[in-house]
Amino acid sequence: MASGSRATPTRSPSSARPAAPRHQHHHSQSSGGSTSRAGGGGGGGGGGGGGAAAAESVSKAVAQYTLDARLHAVFEQSGASGRSFDYTQSLRASPTPSSEQQIAAYLSRIQRGGHIQPFGCTLAVADDSSFRLLAYSENTADLLDLSPHHSVPSLDSSAVPPPVSLGADARLLFAPSSAVLLERAFAAREISLLNPLWIHSRVSSKPFYAILHRIDVGVVIDLEPARTEDPALSIAGAVQSQKLAVRAISRLQALPGGDVKLLCDTVVEHVRELTGYDRVMVYRFHEDEHGEVVAESRRNNLEPYIGLHYPATDIPQASRFLFRQNRVRMIADCHAAPVRVIQDPALTQPLCLVGSTLRSPHGCHAQYMANMGSIASLVMAVIISSGGDDDHNISRGSIPSAMKLWGLVVCHHTSPRCIPFPLRYACEFLMQAFGLQLNMELQLAHQLSEKHILRTQTLLCDMLLRDSPTGIVTQSPSIMDLVKCDGAALYYHGKYYPLGVTPTEVQIKDIIEWLTMCHGDSTGLSTDSLADAGYPGAAALGDAVSGMAVAYITPSDYLFWFRSHTAKEIKWGGAKHHPEDKDDGQRMHPRSSFKAFLEVVKSRSLPWENAEMDAIHSLQLILRDSFRDSAEGTSNSKAIVNGQVQLGELELRGIDELSSVAREMVRLIETATVPIFAVDTDGCINGWNAKVAELTGLSVEEAMGKSLVNDLIFKESEETVNKLLSRALRGDEDKNVEIKLKTFGPEQSKGPIFVIVNACSSRDYTKNIVGVCFVGQDVTGQKVVMDKFINIQGDYKAIVHNPNPLIPPIFASDENTCCSEWNTAMEKLTGWSRGEVVGKLLVGEVFGNCCRLKGPDALTKFMIVLHNAIGGQDCEKFPFSFFDKNGKYVQALLTANTRSRMDGEAIGAFCFLQIASPELQQAFEIQRHHEKKCYARMKELAYIYQEIKNPLNGIRFTNSLLEMTDLKDDQRQFLETSTACEKQMSKIVKDASLQSIEDGSLVLEKGEFSLGSVMNAVVSQVMIQLRERDLQLIRDIPDEIKEASAYGDQYRIQQVLCDFLLSMVRFAPAENGWVEIQVRPNIKQNSDGTDTMLFPFRFACPGEGLPPEIVQDMFSNSRWTTQEGIGLSICRKILKLMGGEVQYIRESERSFFHIVLELPQPQQAASRGTS
């Protein structure tokens, strides 16, 4: 079966970029064989192509940087010239390319602006023992009461305030105890996890929150005045803020699933309650980078912004990068004059303020806030997972590469407002929890969408089996139910079957004629703008039909889906524009942004999502088979009967194999070292292994047939087990559930057996559930100790610090989440002694800085568990992982219980860790061993990468000497080919970063080149293999290719073409084998009047060609099994970056790569570069 998906668009359809490239996709061409399409994914309605989506996101972001930089430059110029900044006109203006220098300057202004907000002061200190002051804000002396007019005359020289000067020891600005705190913080592995420090000015003892983070030149210390003199009150206030956040998080977690809108509405209410701002909104970033207000809580007299859409430029990519690095951003007063940062002249560039809590807003943003009547703001990033593994190191404010910025929670206030750092930190935890909850909701929504698509596909397939192909438009459900659209149509055997909003029959025939002429070599097309796709009749269709997806079934049969323009879907809940607001279109204001957004999307539809295109492609494949069967006269009923016969034969053959597997499984279960037992659908025992018999004292013969609930467990476990059985018999399998088993015979005197079980649904060969199997772990020893420990009323230290191996790792928290106990088992497990952790905050200092956690969300989850336990809500078997002092990764289950006084008042929490079994630890050790081998291979590659440069320099030098000699024409051609190969290899070695290829940021070095030279270089690289395998090379290359010139990255094109050709050489059959190179260049006329060169290459060989696993690797984005597949996958991505595409097609007698590369002509490329 063919598999494929659409190509990635070069630009978002509605990102306020005035002349955005068209959002258009092509499917692969299949001619009776197996076709694979560049871009990953595939049929079946599932969503693949995560890497393609990531590359698409990166390409959009890179493109938007240029527009952001241009708007920034226009704003700066308008301020310098005294003219007003017309926001809407600036968006509509035709884009002028921004140079790399302009973009770099723009990013520097945003990230290294050199000013801070005046509600605090900033220091930059050398990260060494000198604590030398590298930079400070001009208000530092005043805030720290170090100015001469603040000091009191004294004869004591030590009372004279130290000067705030570059090069001075920063510790002298603070009280001695505060200096000690700073020294400890500087020595920490992850300094930001200790924030905030409570420090005092040396002279006035005024308290400050010190928020620290490391940068390229040292450590930045942001100082914000604190509101109380007592550090204990400060800690209690911070804990109280965290408790409020945890309470809000608990409410979020209690919401019914499947309602993202309700989740967002609840978040804005809680954030407004927590922070007191006048307006709180949830901004969501769409796939095309534009934003939308999806939830809002506001003061009654404020204008609503719910439903507002705004262009991508309203929140520039540089700002989005800052939100990824610093998740919480506060502006206390947009009218306040910024304070300059004075820095050491020896620093090579302005101080990096990306992570600073005090960084001053840019003038453009401050003006935007003022125009909308917002004086103060608090903005929090909403980060969700985009697939991939967690990062191994946690750093507050930083996020793993597998996370994405979903949106923002934005708070506005109509007067100056400054909330203390502990409350902002608590909000950050709330946002992390919101992100986790949102991620689950989005995954659920995606799964429901996939189920809907699969159900619709199933019904459509059923129609095709029972009826003619026209049933998919004449019956219900129809093809309109497959994806979201305003209309759909089938063009079959010259007849037109429209549904909903569609073009007329005359118009659809015109569209088909255009598709045949301009896109006849593909199997489909999708676009959000027919006008931008180049369709001449787009204007006649009007707003009713803007976007279209089409799938070719046969050369004369087509499926269509249509969408109307985006503006139809969008309504703003805000106030209407009043005629007297004359400057509304020019001022930077939400209404202006909404107007600009509608202007951009007026001729566009909503974009076609990857999952929708996969669903369309799957139906396309099904219909192809159906139409082919119909053409061949195959009876559907006969096909079904034949299929059933074949299925029956397969089942009979499989029964013997299943029996063999079943016997082996029974043997493994019987000899397992963990308790395993099973029940039938009535809950009666039908499996009881030797280990559970040993633990309970009940033999296999005695256990068989007994009721698990009525005969074998204690009454307190009955409800749990009944629920467990009921869910497992429905197919819902639960894990880590504790049950209490009875003991019999000699074992009865030892008391009950506690086991943690995983319930697995048992199925027969027809996949019907026939029972439940329980795989358990005996935790009786730990449970008994834990229960005694929790219930003890007197001195518990004898138990805590008992070296008995039955005592589990235990630590305790006081009411302020500070560590109050750390037993011997915890010391042994973590490598950290009791003295090193007691008194420190468990959240951040102990677990975070001492014991590093795996990913930032792990810290949030631990904080929630701890606060819930302190508040009286126990937690059992919470998965908890961390790195010990030596970097060893520890995986455990955490049980947290409330710690109470005799009168029942909660004073903290007891926490117990249950460590993974030795078998599981051995599996982790094997995994680490594989990681170590991968690291060794990386070192080998780094060595090769370094050493290969010297021979390359020698080849380059030799070629340069030969160029200075008198050579014949054929010798000069050989030299040109050798030089081209050398430069290709140099390019690969120089740009060896696969990450830049993966994320779409690879820089292409474009220039004019000769196609003849490229083909000579490509062929020369496969000649040795051709001769060794005695293969014939067939060249079907027109003479004009030798003289043709094009504009692009010559050596990357050589690399890609050579890899694809070499693959055909390697897998061509040796006997009577051949490899064919075919090129058919032509000129493509674009809608803007320019011409481009279209180069379709075909590399073919007889037979099946590449093995399936290599083809699969080529279109994979993350997992590879073959070395050749990795190389082809990288080349496919490079080709995609150059605007090309590749298909692998397998026909009955031959296989071939079909590569299409579209390149500008050198003259037009040069004219564009100078315009």
UniProtKB/Swiss-Prot annotation:
It comes from Oryza sativa subsp. indica. Residues 943-1161 form the Histidine kinase domain. Belongs to the phytochrome family. Residues 38-52 have a biased composition (Gly residues). Residues 661-732, 795-866 form the PAS domain. Residues 1-19 have a biased composition (Low complexity). One of its GO terms (molecular function) is phosphorelay sensor kinase activity. Homodimer. The keyword Transmembrane does not apply. Contains one covalently linked phytochromobilin chromophore. One of its GO terms (biological process) is red, far-red light phototransduction. Gene3D superfamilies: 1.10.287.130, 3.30.450.270, 3.30.450.40, Histidine kinase-like ATPase, C-terminal domain, PAS domain. Coiled coil: none annotated. Regulatory photoreceptor which exists in two forms that are reversibly interconvertible by light: the Pr form that absorbs maximally in the red region of the spectrum and the Pfr form that absorbs maximally in the far-red region. Photoconversion of Pr to Pfr induces an array of morphogenic responses, whereas reconversion of Pfr to Pr cancels the induction of those responses. Pfr controls the expression of a number of nuclear genes including those encoding the small subunit of ribulose-bisphosphate carboxylase, chlorophyll A/B binding protein, protochlorophyllide reductase, rRNA, etc. Residues 1-53 are annotated as: Disordered. InterPro entries: GAF (IPR003018), GAF-like_dom_sf (IPR029016), HATPase_C_sf (IPR036890), His_kinase_dom (IPR005467), HisK_dim/P_dom (IPR003661), HisK_dim/P_sf (IPR036097), PAS (IPR000014), PAS-like_dom_sf (IPR035965). Phytochromobilin binds at C364. Keywords: Chromophore, Photoreceptor protein, Receptor, Repeat, Sensory transduction, Transcription, Transcription regulation. PANTHER family: OS08G0260000 PROTEIN, PHYTOCHROME 1. PROSITE patterns: HIS_KIN, PAS, PHYTOCHROME_1, PHYTOCHROME_2. This is Phytochrome B. Residues 259-442 form the GAF domain.
